[in-house]
Amino acid sequence: MMNKQLYIFGVLFLGACAAPTSSLDLTNEQIDKTGYLFYQNNEINLHISELKDKLLLPAEEYAVPDYINLLPNAKREYRSGHHMGVDFSSPMNYPIRAAFGGVVVRSNAHQKDVDIDTYNYFLDLSSRVGKTPDDIYNFILLGRSVVIDHGYDITDKYRAITVYSHLSSITEGLVAGDIVQKGDIIGLSGNTGTSSGALQNDKGSHLHWELFFDDKTGRYFLGQNIPSDLLKNNIEQLFN
């Protein structure tokens, strides 16, 4: 009987000692994300040290902006969504280059902006849905855009693609399937896909640039779940 009581006491004692260790597990918010390009959890993430090569700034001379609203994760209440890219403040018709070599997936050089009433109609739909539908985002709000597949050449962990949006024009003859080299001019910055584009004026020109990482678990965007105080510095490390 005494041995049984000692056994039960021992189990309870050890269990009581072990239990507090679970509270020491770090939450996603507590993990130091310095140098991470995105962080989903302790298995799905990408650190700058895991890149095989660095990228070029897509709008040469225009650095990663300081203003947090121009970086990933910023709210986009006008379309019931959030920002998944970096807005480089390049002026109208400024040359835009491929940040890395790859194969063109999309090049919609003949895309034309809808009129402002139709534009607002799509924004109203987004509001009613409570998010930005993929079709409205990709085929209306990105405007003229080029998408480049980089395969696993940027990192072995994820397939990577870059997206260059709101272009005023796309390099003549550039079509899906073309191979582009790092630094090739793929178009000129503009405001297509924006309200200014719908109004057919020259205001608000910039390059909206996105970088996505794909694997079997899903798609993740540059800056995803990175705190705002680390975001700019982490993204800057991506470029030469």
For each feature predicted by the language model, list its residue ranges.
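Surface-exposed, glycine-biased beta-strand/turn segments
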Residues: P20-R144, G151-I154, K182, I235-N240
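Histidine-centered active-site/metal-ligand motif
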Residues: H83, H150, H166, H206-H208
